[in-house]
């Protein structure tokens, strides 16, 4: 009988632990529901705010790609799908350059990314002739910017 008495409290302890985990889970489940209700209630208020709030602008390079295309080939157009691909390509290249330049700054224990880190990152990321042309155009752009 004594062993059975000991087992019962042991069985109750996990049950109590389960209840506490259930109690912990219940508020977690209720929070998303409350979160879902807030936008619905705020939906009518947000509808009033939407008039005040302008639509978020998405920054793209589409106009710049188009300008460069017209400089190089004035008689050629570009489809929206191709423009999207070019925009993604430029975003990817800039992301790689930013990662490489931040890595270089970290290696040299510098808190600031300067034009030197960007130039070195361009040389590391872009291949051969493309890197040389990019560096010369970048140097020209920085010189023009600082002189004006």
UniProtKB/Swiss-Prot annotation:
It holds the Pfam family Histone. SMART domains: H2B. GO terms for molecular function: DNA binding; protein heterodimerization activity; structural constituent of chromatin. The keyword Acetylation applies. There is a cross-link at residue 144 (Glycyl lysine isopeptide (Lys-Gly) (interchain with G-Cter in ubiquitin)). The modification N6-acetyllysine is found at residues 7, 36-37. Can be acetylated to form H2BK6ac, H2BK33ac and H2BK34ac. Monoubiquitinated to form H2BK143ub1; may give a specific tag for epigenetic transcriptional activation. Residues 1-57 are annotated as: Disordered. The keyword Coiled coil does not apply. Residues 1-32 have a biased composition (Basic and acidic residues). GO terms for cellular component: nucleosome; nucleus. It is found in: Nucleus; Chromosome. It comes from the Eukaryota. Its main location: nucleus. Keywords: Acetylation, Chromosome, DNA-binding, Isopeptide bond, Nucleosome core, Nucleus, Ubl conjugation. Belongs to the histone H2B family. The nucleosome is a histone octamer containing two molecules each of H2A, H2B, H3 and H4 assembled in one H3-H4 heterotetramer and two H2A-H2B heterodimers. The octamer wraps approximately 147 bp of DNA. Core component of nucleosome. Nucleosomes wrap and compact DNA into chromatin, limiting DNA accessibility to the cellular machineries which require DNA as a template. Histones thereby play a central role in transcription regulation, DNA repair, DNA replication and chromosomal stability. DNA accessibility is regulated via a complex set of post-translational modifications of histones, also called histone code, and nucleosome remodeling. This is Probable histone H2B.1. It comes from Medicago truncatula.
